[in-house]
Amino acid sequence: MKYIYAGDAFQVVPSQRWSAEVPVEAFSIYRGLRTVNPSPYMYFLDFGDFQIAGASPEPLLTVTGRHVSTRPIAGTRPRGSSLEEDRRIADDLLADEKECAEHMMLVDLGRNDLGRVCAYGSVVVDELMQVETYSHVIHIVSSVSGTLRDDVGAMDALRSALPAGTLSGAPKEIGRAHV
């Protein structure tokens, strides 16, 4: 909090590493996750001595040819029990000053991340603060894109985006150094 009070950071995301040994096959957990929380981006990584399973509605980065994009997601609410309730929840979400401020911080981080690897003037916000509905939640989503410079490739773009702003806060350098 002292970095925020001092004006050095807008947001810092405290986190901790968590792991557990469980008496079930890791891939079974992944299959269960697919059933309980179907998401557009799911993964299972088996490194032999440990496994990682995850699900996200958010692609951190997409590179197709020289086109690069990121789709920040921030602002989340559980789905309602009807379409009418979903609409009310979406309206409330877009009216929530804190959620909108956090979302705009991530949009700005996305613009900054892409600006480090894209041709000057090519970075644009394609969509700003659209509401998307998923199986269990409603999110605020934006889209930022640009054209990669000739001297950089997909891995350079990925390095510019890591860590995701949802994990680091802003500015990223402060979040990485102090969390």
Which role fits each region the language model picked out?
Residues 1-178:
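Extended alpha-helical targeting/anchoring segments
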